[in-house]
Curated annotation (Swiss-Prot):
This is Period circadian protein homolog 2. A motif (LXXLL) lies at residues 306-310, 1051-1055. Residues 1157-1257 are annotated as: CRY binding domain. GO terms for molecular function: DNA-binding transcription factor binding; histone deacetylase binding; histone methyltransferase binding; identical protein binding; kinase binding; nuclear receptor binding; pre-mRNA binding; RNA polymerase binding. Residues 179-246, 319-385 form the PAS domain. Expressed in all tissues examined including eye, brain, heart, lung, spleen, liver, pancreas and kidney. In the CNS, highly expressed in the SCN, internal granular layer of granular cells of the olfactory bulb, tuberculum olfactorium, piriform cortex, gyrus dentatus of the hippocampus, cerebellum, pars tuberalis/median eminence, and pituitary, and moderately in the tenia tecta, caudate putamen, accumbens nucleus, superior and inferior colliculus and pineal gland. InterPro entries: PAS, PAS-like_dom_sf, PAS_fold_3, Per1-3_PAS-A, Period_circadian-like_C, Period_circadian_regulator.
Length: 1257
């Protein structure tokens, strides 16, 4: 009947069930109202059921029911009818009383059916009419749901055993009334109710409920609260009142703003009704409810039970008084690609009339005006094109609950899955432009809702779904929280710049402007439509910028006259421009990358191995010659500080000739950044530039942070408190990043160093000729010409830039040549000079290369007043096997002389004399017994007759004057040219802080290109011959060596390693090489036996500096400049060999970054134990996954490695005949104890691992 004819009644069909519930109004109301199964307009019964034909139909159906009952009587039905009659008509007068009982039962049944039909939801009605069968089915299902809910409550409380009741406050009924009255007394539309979580009954309800529902308070006594809820909202009420989800009432005490926000977030919406406002209509009113967990005692002395205390506030239409202001009529929605509502903002409730649960999981298109539905296809096409960027679109009309339409101004965006690059959901931001005609949006709709969507709606939904299943194309930004890369175009810039420092800076300069533009475009509005276009335009502009500008700047730099544009001008411009602020995640991510690269030896050596001399000319003249020394130092400091902290080499370009952290080269490092989202407009590429650009940019950075804070507020973050906290965290991290900047102390010490040098008298600087110094710093052009004549192999020592010509800046003693440019170390035409030192200095001959002597126009330091009592042998051209001893006085100490200096130790009164056997023009001086050593010739083939002459002891007076201390300051500033890693910079910082030797000697050994050699051709060929590593060490600036360099045999290994990364143009056993090798061996007092080294020792210290892991030194090491501490050194001077002296020295005297030696096996054992502990928390493959892997990869089953990567040879050795460029690093084949295979391979590559292992023991 009425669409339900096909339903065949079962023995338990509703035809036999209507008497099951007691025919009283309360029980019927309980049976129906407690239902949660309907999802329609349960509150909009219009009373049609009681009119005309519907009443007739009900009467007919009821007569059929009664006849059926009489025809097929059942004992239960007869008994129930008799009991009902007995209750209502207690007469026992035989047959008449029985007839009257049937009549009364018939009337009661009709009333009950009518009551049930009122509660039947609209979607359950057939053709707008409520049939009796459908009504009885709905009543039966409601009864079952009520029973299930009661069982659920009991099961929930028993299973939980009330775990959260420990800290729950307990109140009596009077106390509950007292604590709730202060919140509800101010609002007449608010009431409080306490519902038992055990029985579901109302234990307490405030008096305000009577005027709100226009009923007596007794109507709620001994009743379940869900009886008054709309059936569709019962499940919502249960989900939000689960005990473990409820906050205790104590959190509401005080009610500050933050707690109030939390209270609002915990709230939910339900419709409540007490009874019928009209005879045939139940009208529900929407309430916003905030639940809390309390314990309530019903009676004194009784056990308290857990209750849900609800603060319920009625929600009014946003268009009725008090109206929501038009500018605040904004809400947001999200829907899935198949156009189903996923989330609805609670602000939509008073504007649309729907509760959130009414719209979620319902089609979006159904709620739109039929004429506006086709617009959604165009909107979603643009959503796909925008790639997550917000944009505005034309207004649409949205239907409210009362059936009216409101006009919305919409903005759309989307969230893109970063893995699949597909749209996960669409975000809509809507503002009401035109309100409804009927301002009561909660009123019932006069027209019934569509039960099934229109076919056009279904077709349109399918089109949109197919459209959004396409992957989103990559663009400048990827929308809300997606992980697309904003810096992907950086690799193009890196390739066009060819590692030229100015090219990189120019590209960096262009990037800064572009990113400022994009930042402004994004910060204008949260939904700015043109921001995506500007971003794409900026990327296109960057990619189309010609590399000719880079090449032109590089060409200017290659002019040896020094008249090119100073490189420091670019970073200074960047410094004074306002930099975009960086997020906490970006800076911390970049800092992690920097620290990783600093500690990665393999990355450093790979970079040096891939470097070619062709890139050298791009690193000249960081300071214009016209600049004052102070300005030059300042600009150099700014440049270096910026670059060391921020610029990293691109890991994606292995062929780039940059070091790990290069001082004067600006490199792209976008490939090393883990992108953390595009919520902030500025990319990660400028992360640390404003942090490390010096004190000038701190104000700008602070201003940028304040601007960003303002922009964040405009962007409309969800919580202002969270935004403010985020800004504070960013600023704090930024400040800490400045404080721990690795060049902070270096800048200060360099500034003091320059100031002291400027105050030092000219007499303290020795007999130097300024022109000679200048010439030595201007010899870059000739050195490059000489380099072009030599075989060019991979070079690491020339990866950093050199300083421009600055007056009174001789090379620094003890620095490795690779830390300096050829202009610093290529003093090939300048002979070596002595340097007074508390331990013997050994000036050895320099053999000038033929190119330097014969080439006209070479700038050579002119001889000046002869240094007292000193001569220097110089080998003329063509005299290779013999020493030609001839005096060569000169003013400036420029040649590679090695001396061991102690901090602040005064110099001897006169220069030490050289052995007569080696320098016939000089007298003998007695040899110190503890410092006797032997010096081997540079090459037995080269000097067969001079071996015995070199084995001479040397000593030095120990009564030095104090007047020559200022010579320790005669070195070039730190930022003219530096090494290839922050570790080397720290070591250089520690070298220059004490007033140690700098003036009387150049570097430890010049580069092979500039070092005076015997024959270019033969030297280059000999350099390729594999030779045994020299067993000598470099004792210069011993206070700067760590524990690894305390013994000569360890440094022998380090120097042997250096053969692998020596400069390709190094001459075999050049004078400078002989100097550093021989002196290193002699000063340490170790007897050496060498077969000759085929490379310049200039890169020994480069390898030493560059390969030390950052964990082996303390970045915060304090320089020992105090005189009292340095005086403690005097008692140890010249008493023992240096290794014994260092072993017996107190810890407070030794450098703080030295680490005690550790047993390698013990360290590995500890690491293996830690790894075993960590293995439990590591992810493991399941058996199914392992089976799949074995099927695909057979090598998994064997437990070994695939043949493609199972390489046992040295991957860094290109050829044994081409220089044996292997990298003996333990890090190359780490033994983690994970399998025996790696350990076996480590043993196989013995020469790779053994030197480093022995060094660490």
């Amino acid at each position: 009947m009425n669409g339900y004819v096909d339903f065949s009644p079962s023995p338990t069909s509703p035809t036999q069930e209507p008497g099951e519930p007691q025919p009283t109004q309360a029980v019927l109301q309980e049976d129906v109202d407690m239902s949660s199964g309907s999802s329609g307009n349960e509150n909009c019964s219009t009373g049609r059921d009681s009119q005309g034909s519907d009443c007739d139909d009900s009467g007919k159906e009821l007569r059929m029911l009664v006849e059926s009952s009489n025809t097929h009587p059942s004992p239960d039905d007869t008994f129930r009818l008799m009991m009902t009659e007995a209750e209502h008509n207690p007469s026992t007068s035989g047959c008449s009383s029985e007839q009257s009982a049937k009549a009364d039962a018939h009337k009661e049944l009709i009333r009950t059916l009518r009551e049930l039909k009122v509660h039947l939801p609209a979607d359950k009605k057939a053709k707008g009419k409520a049939s009796t069968l459908a009504t009885l089915k709905y009543a039966l299902r409601s009864v079952k749901q009520v029973k299930a809910n009661e069982e659920y409550y009991q099961l929930l409380m028993s299973s939980e055993s009330q775990p959260c009741s420990v800290d729950v406050p307990s109140y009596t009924m009077e106390q509950v009334e007292g604590i709730t009255s202060e919140y509800i007394v101010k609002n007449s539309d608010m009431f409080a109710v306490a519902v038992s979580l055990v029985s579901g009954k109302i234990l307490y309800i405030s008096n305000q409920v009577a005027p709100i529902f226009h009923c007596k308070k007794d109507a709620f006594s001994d009743a379940k609260f869900v009886e008054f809820l709309a059936p569709h909202d019962v499940s919502v009420f249960h989900s939000y009142t689960t005990p473990y989800k409820l906050p205790p009432w104590s959190v509401s005490s005080g009610l500050d703003s933050f707690t109030q926000e939390c209270m609002e977030e915990k709230s939910f919406f339900c419709r409540v009704s007490v009874g019928k406002h009209h005879e045939n209509e139940i009208r529900y009113q929407p309430f916003r409810m905030t639940p809390y967990l309390v314990k309530v005692q019903e009676q004194k002395g009784a056990a308290s039970q857990l209750c849900c205390l609800l603060l319920a506030e009625r929600v009014h239409s946003g268009y009725e008084a008090p109206r929501i202001p038009p500018e605040k009529r904004i809400f947001t929605t999200t829907h899935t690609p198949n156009c189903l509502f996923q989330d609805v903002d609670e602000r939509a409730v008073p504007l649309l009339g729907y509760l959130p649960q009414d719209l979620i999981e319902t089609p979006v298109l159904v709620q739109l005006h039929p004429s506006d539905r086709p617009l959604m296809l165009a909107i979603h096409k643009k959503i796909l094109q925008a790639s997550g960027q917000p944009f505005d679109y034309s207004p649409i009309r949205f239907r409210t609950r009362n059936g009216e339409y409101i006009t919305l101004d919409t903005s759309w965006s989307s969230f893109i899955n970063p893995w699949s690059r597909k749209i996960s959901f669409i975000i809509g931001r809507h503002k009401v432009r035109v309100g409804p005609l009927n301002e009561d949006v909660f009123a019932a709709s006069p027209c019934p809702e569509e039960k099934t969507p229109h076919p056009s709606v279904q077709e349109l939904t399918e089109q949109i779904h197919r459209l959004l299943m396409q992957p989103v194309p990559h663009s400048g930004s990827s929308g809300y929280g997606s992980l697309g890369s904003n810096g992907s175009h950086e690799h193009l810039m890196s390739q066009t710049s060819s590692s030229d420092s100015n090219g990189q800076e120019e590209s960096h300069w262009r990037r800064s402007g572009i990113f400022k533009t994009s930042g402004k475009s994004q910060s204008k509005s949260h939904f700015s439509p043109e921001s995506g276009g500007q971003k794409e335009a900026s990327v296109a502009e960057m990619q189309s910028s010609p590399p000719a500008q880079v090449r032109s700047v590089t060409t200017m730099e290659r002019d040896s006259s020094g008249a090119s544009l100073p490189k420091a001008s670019f970073p200074e411009e960047l410094t004074y421009k306002s930099q975009p602020p960086c997020s906490y995640q970006q800076i911390s991510c970049l800092d992690s990358v920097i620290r990783y690269l600093e500690s990665c030896n393999e990355a450093a050596t790979l970079k040096r191995k891939c470097e070619f001399p062709a890139n050298i000319p791009s690193r000249k003249a960081t300071v214009s010659p016209g600049l004052h020394s102070g300005e030059a130092a300042r600009s150099s400091k700014v440049t270096s500080h910026t670059e060391v902290s921020a610029h990293l080499s691109s890991l994606a370009l292995p062929g780039k000739a940059e070091s790990v952290v290069s001082l004067t080269s600006q490199c792209s490092y976008s490939s090393t950044i883990v992108h953390v989202g595009d919520k902030k407009p500025q990319p990660e590429l400028e992360t640390v530039e404003d942090v490390a650009s010096g004190p000038e940019s701190q104000d700008d950075a602070a201003g940028g942070l304040s601007q960003e804070k303002g922009s964040l507020q405009k962007l409309g973050l969800t919580k202002e408190v969270l935004a403010a906290h985020t800004q504070r965290e960013e600023q704090g991290f930024l400040q800490r990043f400045r404080e721990v900047s690795r060049l902070g102390a270096l800048q200060a010490h360099c500034q003091n160093y320059l100031q002291e040098r400027s105050r030092a008298p000219a007499s303290d600087r020795g007999l130097r000729n300024a022109s000679g110094i200048e010439s030595s710093w201007k010899k870059t052009g000739k050195n490059r010409k000489l380099k072009s004549k030599r075989v060019k192999t991979r070079d690491s020592s020339e990866s950093t830039g050199s300083g421009g010509p600055v007056s009174h800046r001789p090379p620094l003693v003890g620095l490795n040549a690779t830390a300096w440019s050829p202009s610093d170390t290529s003093q090939s035409s300048c002979p070596s000079a002595p340097f007074p030192a508390p331990v013997p200095a050994y000036p050895l001959p320099v053999f000038p290369a033929p190119g330097i002597v014969s080439t006209p126009g070479t700038v050579v330091a002119p001889p000046a007043a002869a240094h007292t009592g000193f001569t220097m042998p110089v080998v003329p051209m063509g005299t290779q096997p013999e020493f030609a001893v001839q005096p060569l006085p000169f003013a400036a100490p420029l040649a590679p002389v090695m001396a061991f200096m102690l901090p602040s130790y005064p110099f001897p009164p006169a220069t030490p004399n050289l052995p007569q056997a080696f320098f016939p023009s000089q007298p003998h001086f007695p040899a110190h017994p503890t410092l006797a050593s032997e010096i081997t010739p540079a090459s037995q083939a080269e000097f067969p007759s001079r071996t015995s002459m070199l084995r001479q002891p040397c000593a030095c007076p120990v009564t030095p004057p104090a007047g020559t201390v200022a010579l320790g300051r005669a070195s070039p500033p730190l930022f003219q040219s530096r090494g290839s890693s922050p570790l080397q910079l720290n070591l250089l910082q520690l070298e220059e802080a004490p007033e140690s030797s700098t003036g009387a000697a150049g570097t430890l050994g010049t580069t092979g290109t500039a070092a005076s050699g015997l024959d270019c051709t033969s030297g280059a060929s000999r350099d390729r011959q594999p030779k045994a590593p020299p067993t000598c060490s470099e004792p210069s600036d011993t206070q700067n060596s760590d524990a690894i360099s305390t013994s000569s045999d360890l440094l022998n290994l380090l120097l042997g390693e250096d053969l692998c990364s020596a400069t390709g143009s190094a001459l075999s056993r050049s004078g400078a090489s002989a100097t550093s090798d021989s002196l290193g061996s002699s000063s340490l007092g170790c007897d050496t036996s060498r077969s000759g080294a085929g490379s310049s020792d200039t890169s020994h210290t480069s390898k030493y500096f560059g390969s030390i892991d950052s964990s082996e030194n303390n970045h915060k090491a304090k320089m020992i400049t105090d005189t009292e501490e340095s005086e403690q050194f005097i008692k140890y001077v010249l008493q023992d060999p240096i290794w014994l002296l260092m072993a017996n020295t107190d810890d407070n005297i030794m450098m703080t970054y030295q680490l005690p030696s550790r047993d390698l096996q013990a360290v590995l054992k500890e690491d293996q134990e830690k790894l075993k502990l960590l293995q439990r928390s590591q992810p493991h493959f399941t058996e199914g996954q392992r089976r799949e892997l074995r099927e695909v990869h057979p090598w998994v089953h064997t437990g070994g490695l695939p043949t493609a990567i199972d390489v046992t040879g040295c991957v860094y050795c290109e050829s044994e005949e081409k220089g044996n460029l292997c990298l003996p690093y333990e890090e190359d084949s780490p033994s983690l104890g994970l399998c025996d295979t790696s350990e076996a391979k480590e043993e196989e590559s013995g020469q790779l691992a053994n030197p480093r292992k022995e060094a660490q023991t």
